[in-house]
């Protein structure tokens, strides 16, 4: 099995934490991608989506999307599943969807600010996304902190979101530390509690 990841990608981090949680490091060839946009990068050669994370199963089949990859690895692993069963499953997956939605809203803006001059930014769209994010982050803060210090696929993604946001705060132009201190405090406690979260983030 092969796994291509970027050290800053919150989606790739979720997969990486799943690998670490289930002690699959010896079974998965973990490849760090320096430039995800490089068309010559191995993950872009056979993967039509050309997105990070990228994963190739031992059969040679490509798996697309961080949730699918994480669930595949979770089923291979022997540790406690990161995907709960029963009615808890839908609550956890709902939190996961909120965190992913915030990332999907925000990451293109970060890329736009990185690669385009300010006069070419879509500022009205940025304002609209920021308003959505504020509402979504308020909900996420409530739901995530209600989970307590528990490790599941949703809390992993929320931690990855917050740490990534803090890394890109200057570019995003909005502080989670100032506006959502409970979410920030919860994230710090999660990182301090679970070694796999610490091991998956070098910033």
Feature annotation, model-predicted:
Residues 87, 151-153, 201-203:
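Short, surface-exposed recognition loops or helix-turn segments adjacent to catalytic cores
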Residues 1-123:
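GST-like domain detector, emphasizing the conserved glutathione-binding G-site
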Residues 99-186:
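GST-like fold's C-terminal all-alpha helical module
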Residues 79, 142-150, 194-200:
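Surface-exposed helix-capping loop/turn segments at secondary-structure junctions
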Residues 177-203:
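Long hydrophobic alpha-helical segments typical of transmembrane helices together
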Residues 70, 74, 93-96, 137, ...:
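Non-transmembrane alpha-helical segments in soluble domains
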């Amino acid at each position: 099995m092969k796994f291509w990841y970027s050290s800053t990608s919150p989606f790739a981090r979720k997969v990486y934490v799943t690998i670490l949680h289930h002690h699959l490091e010896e079974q998965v060839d973990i490849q760090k991608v320096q430039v995800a946009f490089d068309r010559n990068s191995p993950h872009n050669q056979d993967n039509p989506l050309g997105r990070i994370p990228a994963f190739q199963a031992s059969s040679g089949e490509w798996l697309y999307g961080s949730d699918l990859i994480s669930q595949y690895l979770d089923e291979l692993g022997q540790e406690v599943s990161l995907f709960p069963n029963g009615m808890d499953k839908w609550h956890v997956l709902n939190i996961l969807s909120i965190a992913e939605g915030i990332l999907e809203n925000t990451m293109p803006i970060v890329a736009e600010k990185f690669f385009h001059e300010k006069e070419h930014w879509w500022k009205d769209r940025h304002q609209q996304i920021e308003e959505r994010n504020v509402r979504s982050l308020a909900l996420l803060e409530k739901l995530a902190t209600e989970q307590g210090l528990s490790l599941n696929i949703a809390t992993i993604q929320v931690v990855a979101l917050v740490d990534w946001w803090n890394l890109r705060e200057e570019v995003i132009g909005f502080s989670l530390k100032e506006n959502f201190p409970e979410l920030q405090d919860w994230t710090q406690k999660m990182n301090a509690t679970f070694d796999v979260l610490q091991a998956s983030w070098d910033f």
